[in-house]
Amino acid sequence: YMRQVANSWNRTEPWSQQDQAYRLYVLALAGKPDLAAMNRLKETRLQRPVSQWLLASAYALSNQQEIATKMIRDLSFEVTPYRETGGTFGSTTRDNALILQSMVILNMQQDAYRMLEKISKAMGSGNWYSTQETSFALYAAAQFVQKYLGSQKGIDITVKTNSGNENVKTDKTIWQKQLVLQGDKASVTVTNNGQGSLFVRQINSSAPL
């Protein structure tokens, strides 16, 4: 059915373009890409960045990585704030989640992490989100974790600071260390001894004089 609808599609409205891009993305996810319909959509002037992200994902899933890479070159990560109360019930957060899915498929790990942070901050804000927004956000986050952290079992790192080296091995996935200033400087080097991805965040704080 989806292939039939994809082949008969001939609209140009932004929302319809996004519907078609998502349709082709799902077909590619199912291992049944429709390259003819994908090529037709690619030749259309896509009016929403998320449509381009979805179509690029469809190409990547169809072993057309070169085309996918060209499509996302200089493509915006930003979604204009909006919320639909009908149609696809789209929103900024829902579209960010779709872009995160695309980034994971296209192996854009650093960009995907920043998008995951943005989505996590939004979902943790206490604002109301629809079931669709929540489900897309959780699904995209799960894809990120599965690809980049799925095989990781805890943390195995070496931390070098002003006071020496420290080997840290724990089953936990989060570890914190407070650095002590020596004079007005504190330096740290973290070496990942494990097989999975490691994300390091430095948080600075000070008291006014």
Predicted stretch roles:
Residues 6-209:
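Long, domain-scale non-catalytic interaction/scaffolding regions in large secretory-pathway
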Residues 1-4:
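Acidic/histidine-rich catalytic neighborhood
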